[in-house]
Amino acid sequence: MSKTVVRKNESLDDALRRFKRSVSKAGTLQESRKREFYEKPSVKRKKKSEAARKRKKF
C-alpha cells in the first residue's frame, strides 16, 4: 500500500504527483487490473505464451 504524507508548504498537486509515482512504482494499478476478473489457468498460460512469442518476435 502506498502512503504519502503531505509535507509542510507542499501543494496538493505536488503531493498527488508523488503519490501517483509511488503507486506506479509499486505496480498497484497493474496488479488490481490483472486481478479484477477471474482468469482460468489455461487462459493465463495462453496469454503468457503469446506474450513470450511477442517479445521473441522483436
Swiss-Prot record:
Segments passing through the bilayer: none
| Record-level Gene Ontology MF annotations | structural constituent of ribosome
User: Which Gene Ontology cellular-component terms appear in the entry?
Assistant: ribonucleoprotein complex; ribosome
Pfam families given in the database record: Ribosomal_S21
> Is the Hydrolase keyword given for this protein?
no
Arranged from A to Z, the UniProt key words for this protein are: Ribonucleoprotein, Ribosomal protein
Note whether Ribonucleoprotein occurs among the keywords.
Answer: yes
A biological process (GO) of this protein is: translation
HAMAP family to which the protein is assigned, alphabetical:
Ribosomal_bS21 (MF_00358)
Name of the featured protein: Small ribosomal subunit protein bS21
| Native organism | Enterococcus faecalis (strain ATCC 700802 / V583)
The gene it comes from is rpsU
